[in-house]
Design a protein with these regions (language model features):
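C-terminal ends and interior cores of transmembrane alpha-helices
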Residues: 39-52, 244-246
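Extracytoplasmic gate region of multi-pass secondary transporters
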Residues: 168-213, 217-223
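Helix-loop-helix hairpin linking two adjacent transmembrane segments in secondary transporters
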Residues: 91-147
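Central cavity-lining transmembrane alpha-helices of secondary-active solute carriers
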Residues: 5-23, 213-226
């Protein structure tokens, strides 16, 4: 449906920009790349304040996807300069916990805005965007004043062809396929579960929409508990258990 185009745009641009972002990061540094991602995200959240036309929302979600690609590609390497060893995996998982909270709250903030439960300044459901835009501004300011010593890469930056050639290694290829499957399940559950429940089980819209909320409740809980479990358990064993549960 038309509604499914918007979340798909976010991941489409991640597919396009992930490799070029890695090359950009090698040239300007990890911190500057993350700052750039936050600035692009800020722009994507600013546009809906001026309207909700179809074209404006397409541009907004495209910029959101580009910002997401820049951030996802550069944030983990940047964090590795601060957190090392066994704590890195748990710190990355805790970051997913924060992300899951944002995903869980988004539909409720939009609903509260649409029903005028919270002040919306005549934006209605679009009040969601300036709220998250403020969070982006805070992140930009805090990261900009934070001193991070980045490890310098030795040798020449990798070319686009060299990055693609990594898929020739079985481990890299299997990891790539695994990530695609995981993201597909995540996005598919989020966007299509309510529709399937309405069509197959005859549920009402409110009851079917709760399926998405239930998914994010357990995802949030899983990320939170996982961040602590990974401090005690081997990351490889934890990954195997998580894959089996999926």
């Amino acid at each position: 449906s038309q509604a499914n185009i918007f979340p798909s745009l976010v991941f489409f641009w991640f597919l396009i920009f992930s490799v070029p972002t890695g090359m950009l990061m090698s040239r300007i540094g990890q911190k500057k790349t993350v700052l750039l991602s936050l600035i692009v995200t800020f722009a994507s959240l600013l546009l809906p304040v001026f309207g909700d036309s179809y074209m404006l929302m397409l541009i907004s979600f495209s910029l959101l996807g580009i910002g997401n690609a820049l951030m996802q590609t550069s944030l983990n390497p940047l964090l590795s300069n601060i957190v090392r060893g066994d704590r890195l995996a748990s710190s990355l998982t805790f970051g997913q916990f924060v992300k899951a909270i944002a995903s869980f709250l988004a539909p409720y903030i939009a609903m509260w805005g649409a029903t005028q439960t919270i002040p919306t300044f005549d934006l209605g459901w679009r009040i969601l965007f300036p709220i998250y835009m403020i969070v982006a501004v805070i992140a930009i300011l805090l990261l900009n004043v934070t001193q991070i010593k980045e490890e310098k890469e030795e040798g020449k930056p990798s070319t686009f062809g060299q990055c693609i050639a990594l898929l020739g290694k079985p481990f890299i290829l299997l990891s790539f396929i695994g990530i695609m499957c995981h993201v597909g399940i995540d996005v598919g559950t989020n966007t299509t579960a309510p529709k399937i429940l309405m069509e197959r089980l005859g549920m009402g819209l409110d009851d079917a929409a709760f399926a998405t909320s239930l998914y994010f409740i357990f995802r949030t809980a899983g990320c939170f508990t996982g961040s602590f479990i990974l401090r005690k358990m081997n990351a490889k064993s934890f990954f195997a258990i998580s894959s089996f549960m999926m």
